[in-house]
Each structure stands twice: as structure tokens, then as C-alpha cells.
Amino acid sequence: MDDAYFLKQALSEAQKAFDADEVPIGAVIIMENRIIGRGHNQVETLTDPTAHAEIIALTSAFNFLGAKYLPEATIYVTVEPCAMCCGALYWSKIGKLVYGAADPKHGGLSRVALHPKTEILGNIYANDCIDLMQSFFRKKR
């Protein structure tokens, strides 16, 4: 299993958000090639502006491991994380971030936004991630 496989898993989570009429962003967290946390946007469902895919996936991984730091873990997210989610990733000490599509408008990614040891890899399946987002917003308009 590789980055492409796990980003496809994150896209599957994003589809769940799309189906629930949420902004279609999904995330999975892995350790040792095993998914330990997953999430998709649930902002509208939970009436909670912090219920982003990354936050839900992080909480799931923390609960699974019984730990608050994830230096050996990788998060796969369909869209570049926002500033809030980058902050959560920073405090989790996540080992690696892999994202699908950049988000120039709302993305909060910068080298200082994440833990200095966090590896970053972007633009994996970017077109698939963008297509899902565009489909969602076309449906809304």
C-alpha cells in the first residue's frame, strides 16, 4: 500500500461528506500501513464549525492509540488543511502530511504552520479531489 492507496481512502471519506451535503473533504491517518483514524467533514451535521475531516480523524487516532502525539503517523487529506487543522496537526506532532489538492483560498499550510519534523507531500490525485469539490459547489449554486 502506498500514498495513492491511502489518498483514495481519504477520497472515499470525502464522498461520505458529499453524500451528506457537507463540503467534501476526507481524511485518514495511518501507522504501519494500517488506518488508525478516519473522518470527513461534519460541520453541518454536528452544527460545529470545528468538525473538519482532519480534526475528526485526529480524535479517532488519539482514541485508538490512547496517545496525544502521532510522530510515526501519516495523515492523508483530500484538500490542503486550513489554519485550524494545521494547528491541530502541529500539536499532534504528525509525522507526515499527504494532501490531494492545494487550497489557495482557505489553505493554511506553510512551513511554520506544522511541526518542524513533519514531512509534506502534496498534489496526489489533485484532479479527483478538485472534481469532487467542484461537483459539490456546482450542486449548491
Q: Model-flagged regions — what are they?
A:
Residues 37, 54-63:
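Glycine/small-residue-rich phosphate/adenosyl-binding loop
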Residues 36-43, 119:
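Short beta->alpha transition motifs characteristic of CBS
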Residues 1-19, 81-141:
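Zinc-dependent deaminase
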